[in-house]
Design a protein with these regions (language model features):
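Short alpha-helical transmembrane segments in multi-pass integral membrane proteins
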Residues: 1-34, 88-155, 186, 202-269, ...
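Alpha-helical transmembrane segments of multipass membrane proteins
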Residues: 46-50, 128, 162-166, 188-193, ...
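Helix-terminus/linker motif at the lipid-water interface of multi-pass membrane proteins
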Residues: 39-61, 130-137, 193-198, 207-215, ...
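Small-residue-enriched core segments of transmembrane alpha-helices in multipass membrane transport
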Residues: 180-187, 305-308, 418-427
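Residue-level signal for transmembrane alpha-helical positions in Major Facilitator Superfamily
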Residues: 28, 32, 44, 80, ...
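N-terminal transmembrane alpha-helices
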Residues: 18-50, 54-55, 68-87, 112-119, ...
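Small-residue-rich hydrophobic transmembrane alpha-helices
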Residues: 60-120, 157-176, 286, 299-357, ...
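Transmembrane helical elements of multi-pass membrane transporters/channels
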Residues: 29-48, 149, 160, 227-231, ...
Length: 472
């Protein structure tokens, strides 16, 4: 019988020795729903990208121009709200449930204030952003509309990400996965009607008229905004209605505490800075790619979507590692934290090695899902096969960073990611792009991911990431 995370935390607090078989089972129990969720999310993104890609090369290029900016803005917000879920995991590990519920309440106030501010900022700059990024004039209107609609939904996007992360911190990986899968399905349904115009389709041998808004790129953004809004409301509803360690119907204060703010500053600020560093580097990479032509822009954008099949499994395991290490650190069990960290990291390396092999084998077929443009397919398949070799070490960096974040060592993650992205990837891409085009950009990415993985494994082995200790 597999232990629940709550039972494991109780045994850790009592100083019991938990067998390796039990720790492996609970790691799998938390990882598998998250991995399946990420794979379904990626599959839905494939369908989403294919719906836009089959319109032509320009629509995915328009989305690709602003995609790095969506990563930047969303990444900063993710870094900040991840600090709340780390606090909750550590408080639950220490059996401080009232403190955990207090953090949840404060996170709701944070989400409301920062979410609305981020939405206003994104909508405000959307008109000018594509021009700043060097987009061709023919792409700017669609790119601007996409970013504005996406930004308007940020409060709900934040709510979904924040509250599902908190549910995972309690050991409930299934409910967040179900919410995410539903959101992806709704996204595809909304896109089906919003992207395409009214048309005739064949259904069981009969010609049927299907209504469509014909919005193309803005329709894709609107479908995403509507589906994430529903997801955010569902996640909030679970926390409001379910009786559990984070049930906010139980008595508690909504007062913002100095301890929560200190922990948010200590953990959240480096995480937000890390996301900003990674995403701003992506913005500069898009600036480099945007000068390589529409085919390269489309191949780059769709190639990133195709690669998601590999690394999303790593992020699923990362979700589990944050919860597991967070609770182990909260229970003051460094030995268990180390065990979970290495167990999850090895799982990430193994799964992403297998998916990397699949990426190399099926690269042309994957690109063919997204677009019918032969030039985009050929270039996209070429760069995906380069990237396939980096997947195992990418997995190491993803999961090891999650383990370190769960322990509160967000500063170490920030430094390693800053060096690898800005010192290695951007430098190599700048040097190789003029000579090799998009192939040079992706070769730089492959080299950098291998170096990043090695750096994270070295830090994991040294153990200094555990010196941060439990939160206040």
């Amino acid at each position: 019988m597999t232990l629940s995370l709550e039972q494991l935390s109780a045994r850790m607090r009592q100083g019991e020795d938990v067998p390796l078989s039990d720790t492996a089972r609970i790691a799998l129990a938390l990882s598998i729903p998250s991995i399946l969720e990420q794979l379904v999310v990626t599959a839905m993104e494939y369908i989403d990208a294919a719906m836009v890609g089959h319109i032509g090369a320009e629509p995915p290029a328009a989305i690709g121009i602003v995609s790095s900016s969506t990563w930047l803005l969303h990444g900063i917000l993710v870094g900040l709200y991840t600090a709340f879920s780390i606090q909750i995991a550590q408080y639950l590990g220490a059996d401080r449930r009232q403190d955990a519920r207090g953090v949840l309440r404060q996170s709701m106030l944070f989400n409301l204030i920062l979410g609305l501010g981020a939405a206003a900022f994104g909508v405000g700059i959307s008109r000018f952003l594509p021009g700043w990024l060097g987009a061709d004039i023919s792409l700017q209107a669609d790119a601007s509309a996409y970013f504005a609609i996406w930004s308007a939904a940020l409060p709900f996007t934040m709510a979904m990400g924040m509250y599902t992360a908190m549910l995972r911190a309690t050991g409930d990986a299934l409910t967040p996965s179900l919410i995410s899968v539903l959101v992806c399905v709704l996204d595809v349904v909304f896109n089906f009607f919003l992207i395409n115009p009214t048309r005739q389709i064949q259904l069981f041998g009969q010609s049927v008229t299907v209504w469509g808004a014909g919005l193309e790129v803005p329709g894709a953004a609107l479908g995403t905004a509507l589906s994430t809004t529903i997801g955010g409301l569902l996640a909030l509803g679970v926390l409001l209605l379910r009786d559990g360690p984070l049930c906010i119907r139980k008595p508690g204060s909504w007062r913002i505490t100095s301890a929560c703010l200190r922990n948010l500053w200590r953990v959240g600020t480096p995480l937000a800075a890390e996301r900003a560093a990674l995403s701003s580097a992506q913005v500069l990479l898009v600036r480099i790619v945007s000068g390589l032509g529409t085919v390269a822009i489309a191949a780059n954008s769709l190639g990133v979507s195709a690669e998601g099949l590999c690394y999303m499994a790593g992020y699923g395991i990362q979700d589990a590692s944050i919860a597991l290490i967070g609770q182990a650190v909260g229970a003051h069990r460094r030995d268990m934290a180390k065990r979970f960290a290495w167990l999850c990291t090895m799982m990430g390396i193994g799964i992403m090695a297998l998916s990397g092999a699949g990426l190399w084998l099926f690269a042309p077929a994957l690109m063919g899902i997204f677009t019918a443009d032969a030039a985009v397919i050929a270039l996209g398949a070429q760069v995906l096969r380069i990237e396939a070799f980096a997947e195992p070490m990418f997995g190491a960096s993803i999961v090891a960073s999650g383990a370190m974040q769960g322990a509160g060592d967000s500063t170490g993650c920030f430094v390693l990611n800053l060096f690898s992205m800005w010192g290695v990837r951007l430098t190599l891409a700048f040097l190789l792009a003029p000579r090799l085009g998009l192939v040079g950009v992706w070769a730089a990415m492959c080299i950098e991911l291998c170096i990043r993985g090695a750096l994270f494994l070295i830090r994991l082995a040294r153990g200094k990431w555990l010196d941060k200790g439990a939160l206040q």
